[in-house]
């Protein structure tokens, strides 16, 4: 058998496999570096350099320059050219990351309504509750 003090290799060093004729002993090749179109300068298995991928950044889905190749429909509503689609804000959201409480929202709503009100000074003004709009009886 093999010598336990020889090291981690269970085969004695004098055993040489013929060039691939024995199915139990395939020709020596490193499975970490499979033959292929990968350039030899890029180390395989490095997450910074994925195997056989282009070194330039790949555009993200939904952004300009990206055409989805799958069966997925385009994002709705379609974004303007040159802009990525943005999700509509949830109710209560005013801007990106700004949430207003009910009290402040009510105050803002009131102020907004006020700014849209047309102040017409005349007979049909709804602000006056007195009946002075009718003609007076002084003859």
From Swiss-Prot:
Location of the region described as Disordered in the Swiss-Prot/TrEMBL record: 1-139
Organism superkingdom: Eukaryota
Transcription regulation found in the keyword field: yes
Function, as annotated: Negatively regulates TSP1 expression at the level of transcription. This down-regulation was shown to reduce taxane-induced apoptosis.
Compartment list: Nucleus
Keyword Transmembrane helix among UniProt keywords: no
Keywords: Nucleus, Transcription, Transcription regulation
Ranges of Basic residues composition bias in the record: 103-124
Low complexity: bias regions: 125-139
Biased composition (Pro residues): 24-62, 70-91
GO cellular component term, pick one: nucleoplasm
Protein's name in the database: Proline-rich protein 13
């Amino acid at each position: 058998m093999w010598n336990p003090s020889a090291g981690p290799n269970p085969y004695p060093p004098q055993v040489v496999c013929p060039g691939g004729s024995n199915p139990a002993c395939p020709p020596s090749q490193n499975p970490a570096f499979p033959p292929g179109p990968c350039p030899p300068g890029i180390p395989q298995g490095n997450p910074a350099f994925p195997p056989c991928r282009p070194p330039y950044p790949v555009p993200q889905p939904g952004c300009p320059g990206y055409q989805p190749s799958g069966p997925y429909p385009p994002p709705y509503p379609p974004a303007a050219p040159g802009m990525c689609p943005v999700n509509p804000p949830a109710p209560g959201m005013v801007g990106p990351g700004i949430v207003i409480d009910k009290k402040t929202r009510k105050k803002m709503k009131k102020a907004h309504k006020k700014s849209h009100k047309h102040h017409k000074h005349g007979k049909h003004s709804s602000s006056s509750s007195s009946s002075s709009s009718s003609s007076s009886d002084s003859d």
